Amino acid sequence: MHYELHGRMEPDAPTLVLSSGLGGAAAFWLPQLPALTQDYRVLVYDQLGTNKSPANLPAGYSIESMAVELLELLDTLGIRRCHFIGHALGGLVGLQIALLRPQLLQSLVPINAWSSPNPHSARCFAVRLKLLHDSGPAAYVQAQSLFLYPADWIAANSERLARDDAHALAHFPPTMNLVRRIEALLAFDIEAELPRITTPTLLIANRDDMLVPWQRSQHLADNMPNAQLALLNYGGHASSVSDSEPFNQILLDHLAEQCGQVAAA
């Protein structure tokens, strides 16, 4: 898989692993890199079957498959401890890693994530799949911002979104890869295993997320023994892009607290 390392490169530098959502792109995290790379080594990567990590994803592809692929990359790079930050699908990957290899994680930050299928989100993804199958990639890409951002932000950033749409269409993944990634996130269900996740966890959610109800993060916080919730009022599903400054500050505060606790121990 394509990956990039940014920030501090000393062997003892605290390491952050950032995992993006359905689009799978390392570039999703560009609004966070200036804030995070001052004090941390930051790994971003293109998930398999997306962007610069071409592959034909097999039938039965799952969130666990994605977690295992990332663990193999981290093993290759010699990363044995990290703080994991994942957006939506990337948050599910982090939750899966917390079950597969809890000793890897110093802390976990799932953003607008969930633990089991939700009828509202399933309806949204069904609409996106229908757009893809019936109208093609251009319609799918054009509709994407409606699920990701607040209406006023979309109106104020129309030129930027036009550029983003053109880039997304030019780099659109194989249709079956996208279908299998959506199927994987819709099938994800670790409800019965939540009490096993004891990694220090900060859940970040947005009240105005129209794709994933913020109550899904509240549910995670209520059912994981070492988790808390930070709830933002504005920014939509991708507030890390649409309102990055308060989002970044929440991350920095969390990481400072976690790294301080490690140093004290």
Curated annotation (Swiss-Prot):
The keyword Hydrolase applies. Transmembrane segments: none annotated. Residues 14-123 form the AB hydrolase-1 domain. GO terms for biological process: nitrogen utilization; uracil catabolic process. The keyword Hydrolase applies. The gene is rutD. GO terms for molecular function: hydrolase activity, acting on carbon-nitrogen (but not peptide) bonds, in linear amides. HAMAP family: RutD (MF_00832). It is an enzyme of class 3 (hydrolase). It comes from Stutzerimonas stutzeri (strain A1501). Disulfide bonds: none annotated. Involved in pyrimidine catabolism. May facilitate the hydrolysis of carbamate, a reaction that can also occur spontaneously. GO terms for cellular component: membrane. This is Putative carbamate hydrolase RutD. Belongs to the AB hydrolase superfamily. Hydrolase RutD family. Pfam families: Abhydrolase_1 (PF00561). It catalyses: carbamate + 2 H(+) = NH4(+) + CO2.
